[in-house]
Amino acid sequence: MLLPESFDDDFIALIPRHRDFISRLLNEKIVETYAISSDRSRGWVTINGDDEAAVRAVVEQFQLYYFMRGVEIDELFIFDSIASRFPHISLN
């Protein structure tokens, strides 16, 4: 997804509610990952859903959705990350 080139007051005012919503989705394991580029121009979200329509329904609930352009939804065949693996055992 692409974010606006500049953030106006309306966009900035929505950020706290958007972050709260993303945090809730992370806690509920609906969102697996959420990232924004360092220049704040692009974002990536990995969402668990039954199909594209279910994922789009989640994205459309984002408080910042109407500011986003170029939202693409791709179904993943494989998603592997260190965060999704079992924790290492520590022998104290």
Language model: regions and residue ranges:
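Glycine-rich beta-strand-turn "strand-cap" elements at beta-sheet edges
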Residues: S37-S38, L64-N92
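Short, surface-exposed linear patches
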Residues: H18-S23, A54-A57, F67-V71
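Short S/T/G/P-rich N-terminal loop/turn motif that feeds into the first structured element of a domain
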Residues: M1-T33, D39-R40, A83-N92
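Short, well-ordered beta-strand segments in beta-rich or mixed alpha/beta enzyme
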Residues: M1-L2, A35-F62
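Residue-level marker of positions within ordered structural domains that often coincide
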Residues: S23, E60, I78
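A short linear boundary/processing microfeature
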Residues: E28, Q61-Y65
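Generic structural motif
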Residues: P4-S6, D50, L76-S81
